[in-house]
Design a protein with these regions (language model features):
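ABC family nucleotide-binding domain
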Residues: 21-227, 232-235
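ABC-family P-loop ATPase nucleotide-binding domain
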Residues: 1-31, 243-260, 265, 269-283
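Short beta-strand in the C-terminal region of the ABC ATPase nucleotide-binding domain
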Residues: 234, 239-242
C-alpha cells in the first residue's frame, strides 16, 4: 500500500518523487469568511511528508473549515494553499475535481458510502472516476479490502456492515488512488470504543509506512495515539502547536488530563504490516 503522489495535471506540477520531510501542505495566511463570520483568520500551517498532524478545538473554531480548504471543497477568501506543489487557488473547477480524486483521500465520520453499491464497488468507483478500467479498479479494491481485513465483506451492501467495517471500506476508498495526503474528519466519531481503537491502529500503521495524515477531531485520545504533532485552534487561529513525540514524558493529553501512556505515533512500531499482512513501503 504505497502512498503515491500524482498531480492533478496542472501546468508546472512537481515531480512525483518526494523526499522525506518535504513540505506537502502549506497554508500561508489563509482566511475564510462566510458573510459576517470569519471562520479562518490569517492561518498559516505546514505539514511535511510522513507527518501525522491532529487539529483540535471547540466547535466553531475553524478546524472543519481548515480541512475543507485543504480538501479542495472550498476556496479561501484570502491567502494561499499549496498541496504537493499545487496552488489550489490557481486550479480551475475541473482541476480541483481532479485534485480531490487523485491527490487527497478523505475519511468521513459517517462513512459516506453509496448505499446501492456493495463494498467492493464503493471502493473501486474512486479509481474508475479517474479513468482506471473497471477490471483494474476492482482488482486493486479487492487488494485493499484484503489488507484492511474486510475482503470477506466485499459483496455486502453498507447497511449490512458494522460501523467498523464501513469505516474500513471508507479507508480503502480513500487510499484507492494512492493519495499524497490522507484527510480524516472525526474518523472514530461514529464508532463504538472497540471499533474506534481498531481504526486508530489502522491510521497508525498507515503513518508508519509513510502516509501523510491530517486528522480533525474532538477526541484527545485519538490525537495523542495517532498524531506526532498537535495543532489546537480557537477563533479561526492556531492557539497552540506542539510535538506529541515526547508525550510519554509529558503525561498530559491535549485537554490536560492524564494520558494512558501511549507511545509516540501509536503502539509498538510495525512498519511492514497492516492487519498482519505485508505492505509496500512508500517510495
Amino acid at each position: 500500500m504505497t502512498p503515491h503522489h500524482e498531480s492533478a495535471g496542472s501546468a508546472g506540477s512537481p515531480d512525483s518523487a518526494d523526499s522525506p520531510g518535504q513540505v506537502v501542505v502549506r497554508l500561508d495566511r489563509v482566511s475564510k469568511e462566510y458573510g459576517d463570520t470569519l471562520a479562518l483568520d490569517a492561518l498559516s500551517l505546514e505539514i511535511r511528508r510522513g507527518e501525522a498532524v491532529a487539529v483540535m478545538g471547540p466547535s466553531g473554531c475553524g478546524k472543519s473549515t481548515l480541512l475543507n480548504m485543504v480538501a479542495g471543497l472550498d476556496r479561501p477568501s484570502a491567502g494561499t494553499i499549496d498541496v504537493h506543489g499545487q496552488d489550489l487557488g490557481g486550479l480551475t473547477e475541473t482541476g480541483l475535481a481532479l485534485y480531490r480524486r487523485r491527490d487527497v483521500g478523505m475519511i468521513f465520520q459517517f462513512f459516506n458510502l453509496i448505499d446501492d453499491l456493495p463494498a467492493l464497488d464503493n471502493v473501486a468507483l474512486a479509481a474508475q472516476l479517474t479513468g482506471t478500467s473497471a477490471r483494474q479498479a476492482r482488482r486493486r479494491a479487492l487488494e485493499l479490502l484484503d489488507e484492511l481485513g474486510v475482503a470477506d465483506r466485499r459483496n455486502n451492501y453498507p447497511a449490512t456492515l458494522s460501523g467498523g467495517e464501513r469505516q474500513r471500506v471508507g479507508v480503502a476508498r480513500a487510499l484507492m488512488n494512492r493519495p499524497a495526503l490522507l484527510l480524516a474528519d472525526e474518523p472514530t466519531g461514529a464508532l463504538d470504543s472497540r471499533s474506534g481503537e481498531q481504526v486508530m491502529d489502522l491510521l497508525i500503521d498507515l503513518n508508519q509506512i509513510g502516509q501523510t495524515l491530517l486528522i480533525v477531531t474532538h477526541d484527545p485520545h485519538l490525537a495523542t495515539r495517532c498524531a506526532g504533532r498537535l495543532v489546537e485552534m480557537a477563533d479561526g487561529r492556531i492557539a497552540r502547536e506542539r510535538s506529541l513525540n515526547d508525550r510519554a514524558l509529558d503525561s498530559e493529553t491535549p485537554d490536560g488530563t492524564a494520558s494512558d501512556g501511549a507511545t509516540p505515533n501509536g503502539a509498538t512500531p510495525n512498519s511492514e504490516t497492516l492487519n498482519g499482512k505485508p505492505l509496500e513501503r512508500s517510495a
